[in-house]
A protein has these predicted regions:
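Catalytic cores of secreted or luminal carbohydrate-active enzymes
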Residues: 324-367
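Structural recognition of the beta-strand scaffold that forms the well-ordered cores
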Residues: 40-45, 75-80, 137-140, 206-211, ...
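Aromatic-lined carbohydrate-binding/catalytic grooves of carbohydrate-active enzymes
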Residues: 68-126, 133-194, 198-201, 205-207, ...
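C-terminal segment of N-terminal export signals and the immediately downstream linker at the start
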Residues: 18-39
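C-terminal beta-strand-rich structural cap/linker in extracellular carbohydrate-active enzymes
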Residues: 429-450
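Glycan-recognition surfaces
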Residues: 167-171, 184-185, 191, 233-338
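Carbohydrate-binding surface patches
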Residues: 320, 326-329, 334-336, 370-410
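N-terminal export signals
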Residues: 5-24
Length: 450
C-alpha cells in the first residue's frame, strides 16, 4: 500500500462542517511577523519526484525556478521526503529502510543521491547553490527519531541519554516506516530535537516541512511544541510547515501558535472531488488565517507529475479554479510539477501578477454563502479601494450556470470591473455583477468603486 492509500485509510474522518464561525483570537505578534508575513510561495519535489530526487535533478529545478518563477515571488525551494534513503524508490516506502545518519541519530543526505553531502557537508553545498540563486532552501523531516537509531541505541548529542531513552515505540506513522515518535516527557527528548534543528541551522536551512505531525493531533502536539522550541534554540529563523492534514479545526489555536503553515487536508492531487472538498476546508479555516499563520491547502499539482509519468489531469478550467481558490483564500502557493518540463500554459497560470497580488497583498478575505453550488469569496486590496470577487461553479452538471453577485453585499452601488485572469477591463456595472460559468470554472474580478 502506498502513501496515498495509507493516508486515506488513516484519515477517514470526514469533512468539517461548512460553518466558518470561530472564537479564535489573533495570535500575539508584531503587525509584520518576521517569518512568512505573506503566504509562502515556492516549489516542492514530492508531486514530481516522490522520494527519489537527486542532487542533479534538484539543482536543475532550482535554476529554472530562479529564472522563471522567482521574479513572481516563488522563492522557497524544498526537497521532500526520504532524502536520507539511498534506496528510495518512489511513492512506496521500503519496509526496512536504512537511512543515512550521523553518530547521534540525526539524518543526513544519502551520498549516492547527493554527492556534495560527503565528508560531513550535509546539505550545506546545495543550500549555498540555492541561496546563490536568490532562493531559500527547505527540507522535509518526519516526526520523531529514526528506528535504526533506536535499534543501535545511538547517543544523543551533548548529553548522557541514548535513543532508547526517549523513543516511544508505540508512536509510529501509519504510512511510513522510518521513525518512532519521541516521548517528550523523557529527559533528553528536547535535547534530541534541539540537535536536529541545530544541524539544519548549520546547513543554512530556511524552511522545514515536518510530516506525520497533525494526526492524531493531540498525541503529537508535544512534538510540534518541541520542534517550535528547537527552531528558537537553533538561532536561525526557519519557517515550520506541518503535514499532512487534515489538522483538526479544534486545534487551530494551538497550531498557529507553533507553526507558520499547516495542512488542512491529506495529500492533494489533481482530481476534481479533492479540489471540490478544499472549498469547505478553506472556508472553515478562514478565521485562523493571519500574517505569519497560513492554513495550507497543499501543493499545486500542475504540469509534469509523478516521476515524469503523466501531466496534470485537471482541465484548464479546473486549473484556473485551483489557482483562484488558493489565491483568494491566501493558501501558500507551492508548485509541485517538474520544472524541467514547464510548459507555457502552466507558466502563465503560475505567473499572473494580478492574480498573485490577491494571494500576497489582500485582506478581509472571506467566503460568502453557498447558493446552488456557486461558491463566493470576497477580499479587499491591501492598498486602495479595490475589492476582489471570486465566483466558482462547483456543480458537476454539464450545463453552464448564470452567476450573480449583489454589490450591496459589499456596500457598493457601482463599480468598474476588471477580469484579473484576462488582465482586461470589462466596464462599469451597477447593482450586481453577472457572468456565465461552465462547470468547475471560476472568475476572479477586481471591483473598483465609482
Amino acid at each position: 500500500m502506498n502513501r496515498r492509500e495509507l493516508l486515506a485509510a488513516a484519515g477517514a474522518l470526514g469533512l468539517l462542517s461548512q460553518s466558518t464561525e470561530s472564537n479564535a483570537a489573533p495570535v500575539a505578534n508584531s503587525s509584520t511577523p518576521a517569518l512568512a508575513p505573506t503566504p509562502p510561495m515556492g516549489w516542492n519535489s514530492w508531486n514530481s519526484f516522490a522520494t527519489t530526487i537527486t542532487e542533479e535533478q534538484a539543482i536543475a529545478n532550482a535554476e529554472i525556478m530562479a529564472r522563471e518563477l522567482k521574479p513572481f515571488g516563488y522563492d522557497i525551494f524544498t526537497i521532500d521526503i526520504q532524502w536520507y534513503e539511498g534506496a528510495a524508490k518512489g511513492y512506496d516506502y521500503n519496509t526496512k529502510p536504512i537511512p543515512t545518519m550521523d553518530e547521534h541519530g540525526r539524518l543526513l543526505p544519502a551520498p549516492n543521491r547527493f554527492p556534495s553531502s560527503v565528508k560531513g557537508a550535509g546539505f550545506k553545498p546545495i543550500a549555498d547553490k540555492v541561496h546563490a540563486l536568490g532562493l531559500k532552501f527547505g527540507v522535509h523531516l518526519m516526526r520523531g527519531i529514526p528506528r535504526l537509531a533506536v535499534e543501535r541505541n545511538l547517543p544523543i548529542l551533548g548529553g548522557k541519554w541514548k535513543a532508547r531513552d526517549i523513543a516511544n515505540t508505540e508512536s509510529v506513522c501509519p504510512w511510513n516506516p522510518d521513525m518512532y515518535g519521541v516521548d517528550m516527557s523523557k529527559p533528553g527528548a528536547q535535547d534530541y530535537y534541539n540537535s536536529v534543528f541545530a544541524l539544519l541551522a548549520s546547513w543554512d536551512i530556511d524552511f522545514v516541512k515536518m510530516d506525520d505531525m497533525s494526526r492524531p493531533y493531540d498525541a503529537n502536539a508535544p512534538e510540534i511544541e518541541a520542534a517550535h522550541r528547537a527552531i528558537q534554540a537553533s538561532g536561525r529563523p526557519m519557517i515550520l510547515s506541518l503535514s499532512p492534514g487534515e489538522t483538526p479545526l479544534a486545534s487551530g489555536e494551538h497550531v498557529r501558535r507553533h507553526a507558520q503553515m499547516w495542512r488542512i487536508s491529506d495529500d492533494f492531487w489533481d482530481e476534481w472531488p479533492q479540489l471540490k472538498a478544499q472549498f469547505t476546508r478553506l472556508e472553515n479555516w478562514s478565521m485562523f488565517r493571519q500574517p505569519g499563520r497560513w492554513p495550507d491547502a497543499d501543493m499545486l499539482p500542475l504540469g509534469r507529475l509523478q516521476m515524469g509519468k503523466r501531466d496534470c489531469r485537471f482541465t484548464p478550467d479546473e486549473q484556473r479554479t485551483l489557482m483562484t481558490l488558493w489565491s483568494i483564500a491566501r493558501s501558500p502557493l507551492i508548485m509541485g510539477g517538474d520544472l524541467r518540463h514547464l510548459d507555457p500554459a502552466t507558466l502563465a497560470l503560475l505567473t499572473n501578477r494580478e492574480v498573485l497580488a490577491v494571494n500576497q497583498a489582500s485582506r478581509d478575505n472571506k467566503p460568502a454563502a453557498l447558493i446552488e453550488e456557486v461558491r463566493t469569496w470576497t477580499a479587499r486590496a491591501e492598498q486602495g479601494e479595490t475589492r476582489y470577487l471570486a465566483l466558482f461553479n462547483v456543480s458537476d452538471k454539464k450545463e453552464s450556470k448564470q452567476v450573480h453577485f449583489d454589490l450591496s453585499r459589499l456596500g457598493l452601488k457601482s463599480v468598474k470591473v476588471r477580469d484579473l485572469w484576462a488582465r482586461r477591463d470589462l466596464g462599469t456595472v451597477r447593482g450586481r455583477v453577472s457572468a456565465t460559468l461552465a462547470p468547475h470554472a471560476s472568475l476572479l474580478y477586481g471591483l473598483t468603486p465609482v
